[in-house]
């Protein structure tokens, strides 16, 4: 037989008996929402101050509530607070302790407030603060890439498509590609903060309240731009959580692409980079191994963060307005994604700064795979006036000849090239080096070292203001 208890919950006035033990277990969220304690106290302090200012509660009650909440915050921070599953969540745990500390005045704190708008403001505050931390972490990662890009603006490496050698680029240019990616991530963070910068506190359960509250006062006290404008939406909205998870998933995708490249580049077969000992591990059986575990774990975090996004999208997809208990399941997804994104960004910033770049190996690889074939085609267009499609065909024949000879394009003799097109002159050989190739790519956003340095200057100014 299931266990029944008399109802002593704060909401239990209309219940003749308490919840089943299993109900208590499934209903409790204190195991994870205790993470919101600071935001819950912050919101309650603002709410209590507003209640006093508007004359809804007495100044003496407000003073007791304020002192009690500050005592509770100190107890939690010092590890002296006892959390109870029977009290369900962080809100009830704090309110119960407040009643122990100050007595009946504690019961006035919840005037003109519901747990629906209470949790909405707590969670929104937490996500907003987490987004600010994410922005700072992304700035640090971007700065790490700018440092490496500046150092290697002219370091030649192969550019790839389909993971096949395509054209020479510079390592600095490759680093700047990630600056662009993480710069977009940073923009998404800033956009998300702007969109969510409204306070739901005062929406009450769903319909607002008949008390003469001042929602603008609490919004300002909590650092929001303004209060939300619809009480139904205020308590049922979790777009800010979904948007956080969405931008986290996109950012994690960028981190995963970078991690994959680091894993590949650090293999002996590529040998482009060497990870520092600080971000590597060894093997329990093979003493020679140096494994890129940090990069691999960052790559794996992407699946976890993507899963959190899909989970919350699925939770929210069919909920009628306004609040449903399903929404209690939102927090663990966001907490987990935030923790793992923060860890992944920090790990990647450390790896990027500590990477040892093998300039010689990169340059050697840059010249392989007939990477200057496009330069030959471009020369045929510019110098001989060939239509590009014809130049493409001529170059293809030159590549086939070089392959049959097992030499690079630049190692073909002038006579061999002229056997394909008699108009080719010795001038062409000056355009078939990897250095000349990257230097010639001077178009806006190109890989020429001078253009890479220009983009670095642009991003340094932009990041300083971000």
Swiss-Prot record:
Pathway(s) the chain acts in: Amino-acid biosynthesis; L-arginine biosynthesis; L-arginine from L-ornithine and carbamoyl phosphate: step 3/3
Q: Which biological process annotations from GO are given for this protein?
A: arginine biosynthetic process via ornithine; L-arginine biosynthetic process
Principal place where this protein is found? cytoplasm
Q: Record's Gene Ontology CC terms?
A: cytosol
Tell me what reaction this enzyme catalyses: 2-(N(omega)-L-arginino)succinate = fumarate + L-arginine
Q: What class of enzyme is it?
A: lyase
Keyword terms of this UniProt record: Amino-acid biosynthesis, Arginine biosynthesis, Cytoplasm, Lyase
Please provide, alphabetically and separated by semicolons, the GO molecular function terms listed in this UniProt record.
Answer: argininosuccinate lyase activity
Q: Does the keyword Cytoplasm apply?
A: yes
Localisation per UniProt entry: Cytoplasm
Q: What is its EC number?
A: 4.3.2.1
As for family, the record states:
Belongs to the lyase 1 family. Argininosuccinate lyase subfamily.
Provide the protein name.
Argininosuccinate lyase
Instruction: Please tell me the species this chain comes from.
Output: Brucella canis (strain ATCC 23365 / NCTC 10854 / RM-666)
Q: What is the lineage of its organism?
A: Bacteria, Pseudomonadati, Pseudomonadota, Alphaproteobacteria, Hyphomicrobiales
Q: Which gene encodes it?
A: argH
């Amino acid at each position: 037989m299931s266990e029944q208890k008399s109802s002593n919950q704060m909401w239990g006035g209309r219940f003749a008996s308490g919840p089943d033990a299993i109900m208590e277990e499934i209903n409790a969220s204190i195991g994870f929402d205790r993470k919101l304690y600071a935001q819950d106290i912050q919101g309650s302090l603002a709410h209590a101050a507003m209640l006093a200012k508007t004359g809804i509660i007495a100044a003496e009650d407000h003073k007791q509530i304020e002192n009690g909440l500050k005592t509770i915050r100190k107890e939690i921070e010092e590890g002296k607070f006892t959390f109870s599953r029977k009290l369900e969540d962080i809100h009830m745990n704090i309110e119960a302790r407040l009643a122990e500390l100050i007595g009946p005045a504690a019961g006035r704190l919840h005037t003109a407030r519901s747990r629906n708008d209470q949790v909405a403001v707590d969670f929104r505050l937490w996500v907003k603060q987490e987004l600010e931390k994410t922005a700072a972490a992304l700035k640090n990662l971007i700065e790490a890439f700018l440092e490496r890009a500046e150092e290697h603006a002219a370091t030649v490496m192969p550019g790839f498509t389909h993971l096949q050698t395509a054209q020479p680029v510079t390592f600095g240019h490759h680093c700047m590609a990630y600056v662009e990616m993480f710069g977009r991530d940073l923009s998404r963070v800033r956009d998300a903060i702007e969109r969510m910068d409204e306070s739901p506190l005062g929406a009450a359960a769903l319909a607002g309240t008949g008390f003469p509250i001042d929602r603008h006062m609490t919004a300002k006290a909590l650092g929001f731009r303004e209060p939300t404008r619809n009480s139904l939406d205020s308590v049922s909205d979790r777009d800010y959580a979904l948007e956080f998870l969405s931008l986290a998933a996109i950012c994690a995708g960028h981190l995963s692409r970078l991690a994959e490249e680091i894993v590949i580049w650090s293999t002996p077969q590529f040998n482009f980079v060497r990870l520092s000992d600080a971000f590597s591990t060894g093997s329990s059986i093979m003493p020679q191994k140096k494994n890129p575990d940090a990069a691999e774990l960052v790559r794996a975090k992407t699946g976890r963060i993507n899963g959190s996004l899909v989970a919350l999208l699925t939770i929210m997809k069919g909920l009628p307005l306004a609040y449903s208990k399903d929404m209690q399941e939102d927090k663990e997804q966001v907490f987990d994604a935030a923790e793992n994104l923060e860890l992944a960004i920090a790990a990647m910033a450390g790896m990027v700064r500590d990477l040892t770049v093998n300039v010689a190996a990169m340059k050697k690889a840059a010249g392989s795979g007939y990477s200057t074939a496009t330069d030959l085609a471009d020369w045929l267009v510019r110098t001989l006036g060939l239509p590009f499609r014809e130049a493409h065909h001529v170059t293809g024949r030159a590549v086939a000849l070089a392959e049959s000879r097992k030499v690079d394009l630049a190692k073909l003799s002038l006579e061999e090239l002229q056997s394909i097109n008699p108009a080719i002159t010795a001038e062409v050989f000056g355009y078939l080096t990897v250095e000349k190739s990257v230097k010639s790519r001077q178009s806006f956003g190109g890989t020429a070292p001078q253009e890479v340095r220009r983009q670095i200057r642009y991003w340094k100014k932009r990041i300083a203001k971000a």
